[in-house]
UniProtKB/Swiss-Prot annotation:
Origin species: Pseudoalteromonas atlantica (strain T6c / ATCC BAA-1087)
Protein name as annotated: Protein RnfH
InterPro entries registered for this protein in UniProt: Mopterin_synth/thiamin_S_b (IPR016155), RnfH (IPR005346), RnfH_sf (IPR037021)
Stretch list, region Disordered: 86-108
NCBIfam families: PRK01777.1
Similarity comment: family membership: Belongs to the UPF0125 (RnfH) family.
Record SUPFAM superfamilies: MoaD/ThiS
Lineage of origin: Bacteria, Pseudomonadati, Pseudomonadota, Gammaproteobacteria, Alteromonadales
Taxonomic superkingdom: Bacteria
Length: 108
């Protein structure tokens, strides 16, 4: 490795398996270029970079961002349920079970 190359990790997880791949790229490569260089797109055909969000160390970023040496690039899966809708359903269930006030929604 020359001083113009950087070490990165590319991570992707499914409920039943995950991958953490190491890749060496030239300094100045973008997140998208690093993901493609890692080969992870060939291992997981469900990844669509035009739709998937990505991040570096658990902070979302753009595909055009430039990572630093030692960064972990993460590819995020879309949410299965809308968080607001899921919370509303839990609150309704709590009201029905008597664990929440039917008017205010607070604890009974």
């Amino acid at each position: 490795m020359t001083d113009k190359q950087i070490n990165l990790e590319v991570a992707y997880a499914l409920p039943d398996r995950q991958a953490l791949l190491e890749v060496v790229v030239e300094m100045g490569h973008t997140v998208e270029e690093a993901i493609k260089a890692s080969g992870i797109l060939q291992r997981f055909d469900d990844i669509d970079l035009s739709k998937s969000k990505v991040g570096i160390w658990n902070r979302t970023c753009k595909l055009s961002d430039v990572p630093q040496d030692g960064d972990r690039i993460e590819i995020y899966r879309p949410l299965i349920a809308d968080p607001k809708e899921a919370r509303r359903r839990r609150a309704e269930k709590a009201k029905e079970e008597g664990r929440a006030n039917k008017v205010t929604g607070g604890r009974a």
